[in-house]
């Protein structure tokens, strides 16, 4: 398994050709349920897919985060992705994926399931982000409180969550493609396929 990366600061898009799956969980103790939120975005910050799903109430916050992490990878596979960086705001989960600490025994089976799901991808990695920058997944997880069935979006996002996606795209560095036209001129086009570089 790749080493976890701990990062603070704003949401950071993945490098080409990878996708980033942000995940989060929410507890609804009054209804004995919990919510899972996942949003998958590309290197430009565009939404590839998202989900909001209600589940039974786990024993702890850590367990719902582990379930959300596992769901992030399985959702990525369901929508046909194979190169995925998974990102959440639970340091416990990110650390446990690279640890055999016995103190995690009460949910070790979930950690192992996460590793199995990650192993089904051509490339998988995991990073930590501060909760404030995981807001899209958080909103989707909390949205599950009112759902009877899971909801999925492909290349779309709920209207009430969309402003948070737009705000995160502000930090995406533009990518451009340089194409040699002559020995003296260079034509610049907006990125479509290959030969990209960060400004």
Model-derived segments and spans:
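Primary recognition of RNase H-like, Mg2+-dependent phosphodiesterase/nuclease domains
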Residues: 1-199
């Amino acid at each position: 398994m790749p080493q976890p990366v701990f990062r603070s600061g704003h949401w950071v898009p993945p490098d080409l050709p990878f996708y980033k799956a942000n995940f989060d969980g929410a507890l609804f103790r009054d209804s004995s349920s919990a919510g899972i939120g996942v949003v998958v975005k590309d290197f430009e910050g565009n939404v590839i897919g998202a989900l909001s799903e209600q589940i039974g109430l786990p024993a702890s916050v850590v367990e719902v985060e582990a379930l959300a992490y596992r769901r992030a990878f399985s959702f990525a596979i369901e929508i046909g992705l194979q190169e995925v960086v998974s990102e959440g705001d639970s340091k416990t989960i990110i650390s446990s994926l690279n640890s055999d600490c016995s103190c995690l025994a009460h949910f070790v089976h979930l950690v192992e399931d996460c590793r199995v799901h990650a192993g089904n991808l051509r490339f998988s990695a995991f990073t930590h982000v501060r909760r404030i920058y995981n807001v899209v997944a958080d909103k989707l997880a909390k949205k599950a409180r009112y759902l009877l069935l899971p909801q999925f979006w492909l290349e779309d996002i709920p209207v009430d969550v969309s402003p948070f996606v737009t705000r995160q795209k502000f930090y995406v560095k533009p990518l451009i493609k340089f194409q040699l036209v002559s020995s003296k001129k260079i034509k610049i086009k907006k990125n479509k396929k290959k030969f990209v570089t960060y400004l």
